[in-house]
């Protein structure tokens, strides 16, 4: 039987984001990363579209109606989506670098 190279602790984050608020969600993400890393996690994984939140409301709006509400929510979603060229993930990247860990985080991306 081959020797094991070692084990690694993985953390799966199951904590909600601050929906439609990129900055506060990223700040919360850093707190969660620090907590998981302090417990020994080397790989930390966040849910799908964690930044700025999964658009679960889309399944609750009436098709062909709610235009004003739909437009406002969509505007906020786009406004708070991640722009990689603008460096929107710098907080997460800096935390990962400082703690020497790997982070997988789901985002809505815009360009």
Placement of each model-derived feature along the sequence:
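Hydrophobic structural segments
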Residues: 1-111
């Amino acid at each position: 039987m081959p020797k094991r190279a070692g084990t690694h602790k993985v953390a799966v984050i199951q904590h909600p984001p601050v929906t439609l608020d990129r900055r506060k969600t990223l700040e919360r993400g850093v707190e969660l990363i620090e907590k998981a890393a302090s417990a020994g996690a080397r790989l930390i994984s966040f849910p799908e579209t964690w930044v700025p939140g999964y658009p679960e409301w889309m399944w609750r709006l009436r098709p062909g109606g709610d235009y004003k509400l739909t437009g406002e929510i969509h505007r906020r979603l786009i406004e708070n989506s991640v722009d990689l060229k603008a460096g929107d993930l710098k907080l997460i990247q800096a935390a990962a670098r400082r703690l020497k860990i790997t982070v997988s985080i789901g985002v809505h991306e815009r360009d």
